[in-house]
């Protein structure tokens, strides 16, 4: 028990970290203003945030903070609504972004202290997004079941604050965090509205990603810890315990007596391993276990969220899929494992033999229904998938309109070109091409036939050109703190996500800051 307690507290901060005074340092807001840290997530409007958050704005904000504290002390006013950022959107955003930089400092210091004296891995394996398919083929082809988990959002801000207390012991910072969550983002209801999450993540993307990943990290930390404790035969360090000795004796007895008749039962003890992958707001847990054990893992997830994090989660958020029958939605693909029969004719002298082999093939298909729903939302087609014009782009030049459609089509084509069945992809490209033509026809008040005759075949060649920039998936070989703790191989990768089609001219791929970990037995 003491060993488990030390294990769980190994990464926590036991000393007091006074982060609140850093809010009065000008360089904090300069770091928050650095777009090298927020380039992929912040959307700039009306001239951008650069012109507003100058060094002068930072100095004014610090002066107002000192004045606000002086007035609060002199008037003995504890009303939090009088905070300086409450009535000023600019200063509110600056404070929240600066606070996001501050709360990341303890975790950065922890990572630096861990890496001191250790040699950093210099080689990084840069692969395209299609490297995920051989990864699944090599690791998932022999598995049976997959848990498709939809990670719930923390719906009570106090849960986040209490979890954060294990890492940072600064009371002022905790009060400020509580204030941001309650006042600005309206997370003080039992059921979090979707609009609150949307405005939260849009106005303060860095702060949102930090809190979300911090919350998910906590539940994953407990998950990996309990998972390793359940893998009895793989924990050699726990063999000194008396109950574990009896456990090994029972297993040896089972191996000796029931070795021939109960191989499946023995596999529950000897082959208890799994693969865990997290991306965006979902997680996948794949294993070769029986349906009984997969149901136990499903109940574990639900109970962990409800009893430890006080987050209400319905069992329907965790689906058990059989890879032979069902498909899993992963990274924009519908992936499944099929048994393809293969008949081979073999002839030896005068005798001929027909050998029937069942080969396992990992198939990936484009989810056509969600793609059409996205195109419908972006006004490229109707709910039936029929292309329509894009009237909001009518004020742009012809070259600009064509360029927008071409960029979207190229990115979608590149991202989904790894599919084994491309019929759905061809339909999506057809919708975009026809929507582009109808948008130009509507702008020039012409007909489709006349317009295509004037443009010629060169118009469609632009949609068939290779994509200029290749989207990449980075697998890092650097070691992290918990890699030495867990009795398994853990790999990390940055999973890319596709931004909304409406709000961006270019269908860019942005780092979602959600780590995907694939854990297997060492």
From Swiss-Prot:
Molecular function via GO: RNA binding
GO cellular component annotations of the record: chloroplast
Pfam families in the cross-refs: Intron_maturas2, MatK_N
Subcellular location: Plastid, Chloroplast
Superkingdom as given in the UniProt entry: Eukaryota
GO biological process: mRNA processing; RNA splicing; tRNA processing
Keywords, in A-Z order: Chloroplast, mRNA processing, Plastid, RNA-binding, tRNA processing
InterPro entries from the UniProt entry: Domain_X, Maturase_MatK, Maturase_MatK_N
Family membership: Belongs to the intron maturase 2 family. MatK subfamily.
The protein's role, per its UniProt record: Usually encoded in the trnK tRNA gene intron. Probably assists in splicing its own and other chloroplast group II introns.
Entry protein name: Maturase K
Organism: Sapindus saponaria
